Amino acid sequence: MTKDFKISVSAALISALFSSPYAFAEEPEDGNDGIPRLSAVQISPNVDPKLGVGLYPAKPILRQENPKLPPRGPQGPEKKRARLAEAIQPQVLGGLDARAKGIHSIAIGATAEAAKPAAVAVGAGSIATGVNSVAIGPLSKALGDSAVTYGASSTAQKDGVAIGARASASDTGVAVGFNSKVDAQNSVAIGHSSHVAADHGYSIAIGDLSKTDRENSVSIGHESLNRQLTHLAAGTKDNDAVNVAQLKKEMAETLENARKETLAQSNDVLDAAKKHSNSVARTTLETAEEHANKKSAEALVSAKVYADSNSSHTLKTANSYTDVTVSSSTKKAISESNQYTDHKFSQLDNRLDKLDKRVDKGLASSAALNSLFQPYGVGKVNFTAGVGGYRSSQALAIGSGYRVNESVALKAGVAYAGSSNVMYNASFNIEW
């Protein structure tokens, strides 16, 4: 059995599976190197008997550069015959008007066309126009080199892959699923009606109806269809995704660190406030006490000296003039002396009264400041007012506070007791 015959039989058997009413097989011919070459074989009621195979007796029909062949299209008395299948070099064809034009190409199905070397078109109306392109399915189209389609009405451009009915892939794109569509280069759409838009290059749409909305992205839904990524491991590198457990852990650590930092700062502020408050209070008290004691001592000494002096003088005068009748001028001198002494004691009393009033106003201001409230709600700011009194003095206080969290709060206030008597305070509260 010759090599030509083996090729003829193999091609004929394949073509028989897709038998059409009309077919042809080109005669073997020798090339310049003397090696026989068989272009194509197809089995149908009309077969070239030179190939040595046939299913039904029929007259030879040869085509391709044979002027004796009838023209393509309707011919003979029936006038309804379709065009014959046509092939060039080693190919297999089947179906009405199938064409395999490239070397080593295959066209199977009515009007199927394999136009370039090593192209494969399988299915009625399928087209493979690129080198090494494959179109499988009715009306499928592989329109560029190395393009691959599988499914009815699927389409792929150069280096693209479209799998599924009506799937469409652009250059270097991959579309998998019914009606999936990739309009951008170097992108992937997987799922029913998934879509990567033309200006969203290097993107991926995964899942039914998923659509991309930017380049260099991965979408698992669309604007009104959101999905969850499940069973996601914790990320280990900077550009890894983070799962919920990992996020909760990081948030807990961040909050704990913030709490410790806030507590430390609060303690520092509280210590400083306490030291300042104690220092101011101590200084104020010491100054007031020192001033009062000094003034009292000065007044007492002045009064005593004056009293002693005047008493001695009066006594001497009295002794000198005991036996003398007291004149009106002497009475006047004694009266003036008494008035002067009384005046000095009156001044001392006024000073002591003023000191008492200042102390009373200070205590009233302190009472008013202590009546101010601090906020109870976390994150809340309050404004509060209060009054206070001590003996005959009264004071008005206003203040504001802020609660940082359940454990920490801040408060400050100022009190006014009349004239220039102003007192203020600031406090920091920690609870546990």
UniProtKB/Swiss-Prot annotation:
One biological process term in Gene Ontology: protein transport
GO cellular component, one term: cell outer membrane
Residue span of region Translocator domain: 380-432
UniProt keyword annotations, A-Z: Cell adhesion, Cell outer membrane, Coiled coil, Membrane, Plasmid, Protein transport, Signal, Transmembrane, Transmembrane beta strand, Transport, Virulence
Pfam family, one: YadA_stalk
Induction trigger: Induced at 37 degrees Celsius by the temperature-dependent transcriptional activator LcrF (VirF).
Gene3D superfamilies the UniProt entry points to: GSPII I/J protein-like (3.30.1300.30), Serralysin-like metalloprotease, C-terminal (2.150.10.10)
Transmembrane segments: 379-389, 393-404, 411-417, 421-432
Chain coiled-coil ranges: 242-263
Residues of the signal peptide: 1-25
Main location group: other
GO molecular function terms noted in the UniProt entry: collagen binding
Ranges where the record places region Surface exposed passenger domain: 26-340
Region (Outer membrane translocation of the passenger domain): 341-379
Chain's role: Collagen-binding outer membrane protein forming a fibrillar matrix on the bacterial cell surface. Promotes attachment to eukaryotic cells and after invasion, is the major adhesin in infected tissue. Constitutes an alternative uptake pathway under conditions in which invasin synthesis is repressed.
Quaternary assembly: Homotrimer.
Domain notes: The signal peptide, cleaved at the inner membrane, guides the autotransporter protein to the periplasmic space. Then, insertion of the C-terminal translocator domain in the outer membrane forms a hydrophilic pore for the translocation of the passenger domain to the bacterial cell surface.
Protein family (similarity comment): Belongs to the autotransporter-2 (AT-2) (TC 1.B.40) family.
Protein name, per record: Adhesin YadA
Species, as recorded: Yersinia pseudotuberculosis serotype I (strain IP32953)
